[in-house]
Amino acid sequence: SMISDEWGEMLIRGWNDARWMEQPKRVGDLVARLIGAAPGTVVMGDTLSIKVYQALASALEMKPDRKVVVSDNGNFPTDLYIADGLIKSLDKGHVLKTPNPEDVESLINEDLAVLMLTHVDYRTGRMYDMKRITKMAHDAGAIVIWDLAHSAGAVPVDLAGCEADF
């Protein structure tokens, strides 16, 4: 078994000998097929919450002159807590706007740093047109983060075709 053979016998050598270091990429390639991403573009790790935090922190670094983050008030609560907490800890003047889902598009403009949305609403099943919304945000110069927790494997997703950022 993995525990007795790899962990018990190899100990720390397992990171190289059993290729543990490659696991995030190997599993990422399997998940990539579910979300329409190209091989080598998805890496698994930690938890979704940590990955949302890392993606948002990176996206804000990529747009240092923009201060607006838009989500929607139907987003998964943890995503909103993460965004709010990160914005407070950065203390760089960012603001999180959470309109009703039908009003999100009206906030996509040249002030937008990051658009952070959940593809499928976990309560209602409402689904954003990922390709159209991503294009709108990119045309405005913004970065887009999609939470696919309720989409992957349930509905067709084409991250590569949408040119999604995160």
Residue locations for each model-derived region?
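Pyridoxal 5′-phosphate
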Residues: S1-F166
